Design a protein with these regions (language model features):
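Helix-loop-helix connectors at the membrane interface of multi-pass transporters/channels
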Residues: 1-9, 42, 99-105, 111-119, ...
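Hydrophobic alpha-helical segments and their helix-loop junctions in multi-pass secondary transporters
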Residues: 37-68, 86, 128-135
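Hydrophobic alpha-helical transmembrane segments of multi-pass membrane proteins
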Residues: 15-19, 79-86, 160-174
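Membrane-interface loop-to-helix entry segments
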Residues: 5-57, 113-117
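Membrane-helix boundary/coupling elements in multi-pass transport proteins
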Residues: 93-102, 158-182
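Residue-level signature of transmembrane alpha-helical entry/exit and packing/kink sites
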Residues: 2-10, 14, 36-39, 73-81, ...
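TM-loop-TM module centered on a large, flexible mid-protein loop between adjacent transmembrane helices
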Residues: 1, 114-174
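Hydrophobic, small-residue-rich membrane helices and short re-entrant helix-turn-helix hairpins
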Residues: 23-33, 92-123
Length: 182
């Protein structure tokens, strides 16, 4: 979807997220939990299946990718890491905006932020190892993680991946709206 249709669709989802959060924060919270769980499905599937396929495949793709990381990247990798880290911590600011609604926020919010951060790091670490088991480094650099999904799960799941990405984006929009409207 491109052009004015894209803007109309974005405006619809923005208004829907605002209306949901304004009229029923409880429903918005349940929607947030649901989208988070749905977002984890392809990540965990790729982590588990990708590692297994990468280890038992005839080509030994996972072991080859770990031994040969591919061509050097151009640019400053530290800058890319800093930008990604700053973007990741954006959610922490939003999470603290709902502390008044949490039970024993002084105790529970730091636990949630630290435990949540550790869990997300672990999930993405295993996800990227699984992706490395699904395609060669060169294929991943040229075509992205979709290649690994197509190689491991076939065409149908490779296309369903876009649905998971859309649900993830709606969850992000809802989460931002949930925190920013407070």
């Amino acid at each position: 979807v491109v052009g004015p249709e894209c803007m109309a669709l974005a405006l619809f989802f923005l208004c829907a997220a605002y209306a949901t959060n304004a009229l029923s924060p409880k429903i918005a919270g349940h929607f947030q939990v649901a989208t988070t769980i749905i977002k984890l499905i392809p990540l965990l599937l790729m982590a588990v299946v990708g590692i297994i396929v990468g280890l038992v495949s005839d080509q030994g793709v996972l072991l080859e990718n770990m031994a040969n990381p591919g061509a050097e990247t151009t640019g400053n990798p530290l800058f890319g890491a800093i930008v990604a880290t700053a973007f990741a911590y954006e959610g922490w600011i939003i999470a603290t905006s709902i502390n008044a609604e949490l039970k024993d926020a002084k105790r529970n919010l730091p636990i949630a932020l630290i435990a949540g951060g550790i869990i997300i790091v672990a999930i993405y670490l295993f996800y990227y190892i699984g992706v490395a088991g699904g395609a060669t480094v060169e294929d991943l650099m040229n075509d992205g993680a979709t290649t690994a999904y197509l190689n491991i799960f076939g065409g149908a799941f490779g296309n369903i991946l876009n649905l998971f990405v859309a649900i993830s984006c709606m969850g992000t929009l809802n989460g931002l709206m949930l925190g920013c409207t407070r």
